[in-house]
């Protein structure tokens, strides 16, 4: 089945994501960092484009996302917004830019003015007051729980989260807290597939998985990972969609179709 953008395809909005969840239609998200790739992903039916602080890894060659600044995100958001017509544009708030609700608001205003339609922040229960502060000021929020890369040093490395009863209970508490604070989307990274399914059923808002199994409302991958460009370690949850394709358009279309059809992620891409 083709999911190529048609002229009558409506622009994706925060409210239409909720409608997709209610209808059982899986949400497709990819990272994007420039206008050309944004346009390519958009015309192939990607629902959400994420200007991720992963640009530190794949664009700048950094070992972590921590060196990424707000100015970097603003610049890449401006670039991506120029190539986007239908997809919803979400931008990360980078490390150190949302330590207080007031700081988060000023950071979010910068990226919204650059073209973002939603901001993504990493954190759970502790972040709820900040999310509430932003939502009350008309800033849509996507929360990111589980493995949060900005906390890599606190975690002692990039490790699967939510294993064990206590950790699973904490992740559920995080999910409910960000939802209750007003988040309209939740990314869950590197958690057991069964737990991700429980959280997805527990919430009334869409969940987006990356290394979180098939039961999430949608999936996200870093563009470079999806295209088989691995500058370092290849995560377990990554599939190279360039395999069997001759063009990047073909690879993106294959990714969109695999997410929509529920053939990605497979068991080999998930954690127990």
From Swiss-Prot:
GO terms of molecular function: 3-methyl-2-oxobutanoate hydroxymethyltransferase activity; magnesium ion binding
EC number: 2.1.2.11
Name of this chain's protein: 3-methyl-2-oxobutanoate hydroxymethyltransferase
Residues that, per the record, bind Mg(2+): 53, 92, 122
Compartment(s): Cytoplasm
Catalytic site: 189 (proton acceptor)
Record InterPro entries: Pantoate_hydroxy_MeTrfase (IPR003700), Pyrv/PenolPyrv_kinase-like_dom (IPR015813), Pyrv_kinase-like_dom_sf (IPR040442)
GO biological process: pantothenate biosynthetic process
UniProt catalytic activity: 3-methyl-2-oxobutanoate + (6R)-5,10-methylene-5,6,7,8-tetrahydrofolate + H2O = 2-dehydropantoate + (6S)-5,6,7,8-tetrahydrofolate
The keyword Membrane is assigned to this record: no
Entry keyword annotation includes Cytoplasm: yes
GO cellular component: cytoplasm
General function of this protein: Catalyzes the reversible reaction in which hydroxymethyl group from 5,10-methylenetetrahydrofolate is transferred onto alpha-ketoisovalerate to form ketopantoate.
Annotated cofactor note: Binds 1 Mg(2+) ion per subunit.
EC primary class: transferase
HAMAP family assigned: PanB (MF_00156)
Gene: panB
Family of the protein in this entry: Belongs to the PanB family.
